[in-house]
């Protein structure tokens, strides 16, 4: 549309769909500002409708098939339309190429139509690769089928009961994650929380309040109701028993209809194989996971060594330290690509509940100093 522009003609933009990648481009043409605005409104409405459609597919996949869609590792479950669109903008900046929500809807629709096992799929990665390889495939369906052809069928999944042993900072964050990942309830299910202190109506409400809001991580996007009559927390409509115990051995989880449970110890009180084995003497337990570095047990950093141990043969695992999880993936990438001869590691850590707010006596010299001013830590749990 090439004509001489004159002073009497107002230059605007014309919204046009470019078929090749379903991207939306703006083309200069003769159009008034009002017409331009109307086109922009129409375009935005189309994109938001696509966002609604994608949210519906994401929910259907998660609650019907236990398939979770993510966008470059960003969770999409419980997101609203604006957040979905914003994540697509972020994804485009991340890969240096527009990521169209129209393509995402097309690919997600194909995934929904296929018979796939429970899994986590990165729709951002799939959409990006489809944009690069679309000339190789006649349509999105052929592309998705080819990319996921190695997906294996799985036996019927058996739900896994989960018990949080400890309900401090880490325990509450774990509770958030577990409840947000419940889905249709055929994978990990949070059934109970163990604390040393007895729970009455007041303490239960305090624990509920701490779960509802975290000073760093903000609001929990769900409902938490204290149920003193049954000594439980009702989280997102699901009963989670609150159990009081001083030692692991004294608990009978089967009394709460909990069996073959995964016990996640986040207390920091039991860190050796001998100490953690005490959980396995409790009736109703099957596996133990430690949220700190453990001695004499496999320390697992996912993405690095998770395949070195058979979970059918090992009952106790450690998730390693925060420092180890932070540095190991980077070190592995450097080691695999270039090789590492030697190195020096420095870690910066937030102060913890064990430190004093003001100077006071402590069994460790530096931890006796005021936490907010003490920038020299005494030790790290980073594994060698």
Give the residues covered by each predicted segment:
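N-terminal Rossmann-like NAD(P) cofactor-binding subdomain of oxidoreductases
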Residues: 32-356, 364
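Short, positively charged and aromatic/hydrophobic N-terminal segments
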Residues: 9, 13-27
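Generic detection of intrinsically disordered/low-complexity segments and helix-coil linkers/edges
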Residues: 7-8, 17-19, 56, 345
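Exposed boundary/loop context
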Residues: 5-8, 159-161
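Charged docking surfaces used in two-component/phosphorelay signaling
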Residues: 357-384
């Amino acid at each position: 549309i090439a004509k001489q522009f004159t002073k009497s003609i107002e230059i605007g933009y014309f919204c046009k769909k470019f078929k090749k990648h379903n991207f939306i481009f703006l083309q200069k043409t003769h159009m008034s500002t009002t017409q331009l605005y109307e086109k922009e409104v129409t375009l935005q409405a189309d994109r938001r409708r696509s966002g609604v459609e994608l949210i519906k597919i994401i929910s259907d996949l998660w609650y019907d098939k236990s398939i979770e869609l993510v966008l470059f590792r960003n969770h999409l479950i419980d997101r609203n339309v604006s957040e979905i669109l914003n994540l697509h903008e972020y994804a485009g900046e991340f890969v240096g190429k527009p990521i169209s929500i129209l393509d995402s809807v097309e690919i997600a629709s194909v995934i929904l139509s296929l018979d796939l096992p429970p899994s986590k799929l990165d729709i951002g990665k799939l959409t990006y690769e489809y944009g690069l390889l679309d000339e190789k495939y006649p349509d999105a369906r052929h592309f998705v089928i080819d990319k996921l052809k190695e997906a294996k069928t799985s036996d019927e999944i058996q739900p896994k009961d989960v018990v949080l042993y400890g309900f401090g900072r880490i325990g509450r964050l774990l509770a958030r994650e577990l409840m947000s990942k419940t889905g249709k309830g055929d994978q990990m299910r949070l059934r109970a929380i163990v604390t040393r202190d007895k729970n009455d109506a007041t303490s239960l409400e305090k624990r509920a309040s701490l779960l509802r809001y975290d000073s760093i991580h903000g609001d929990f996007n769900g409902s938490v109701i204290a149920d003193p009559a049954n000594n439980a927390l009702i989280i997102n409509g699901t009963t989670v028993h609150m159990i009081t115990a001083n030692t692991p051995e004294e608990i009978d989880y089967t009394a709460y209809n909990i069996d073959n449970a995964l016990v996640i110890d986040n207390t920091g009180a039991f860190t050796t194989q001998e100490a953690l084995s005490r959980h396995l003497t409790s009736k109703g337990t099957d596996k133990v996971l430690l949220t700190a570095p453990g001695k004499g047990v496999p320390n697992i950093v996912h993405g690095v060594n998770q395949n070195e141990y058979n979970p059918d043969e090992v009952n106790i695992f450690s998730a390693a330290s925060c420092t180890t999880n932070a540095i190991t993936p980077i070190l592995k990438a450097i080691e695999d690509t270039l090789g590492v001869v030697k190195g020096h590691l420095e870690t910066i850590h937030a102060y913890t509940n064990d430190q004093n707010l003001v100077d006071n006596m402590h069994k460790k010299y530096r931890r006796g100093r005021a936490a907010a001013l003490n920038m020299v830590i005494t030790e790290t749990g980073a594994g060698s």
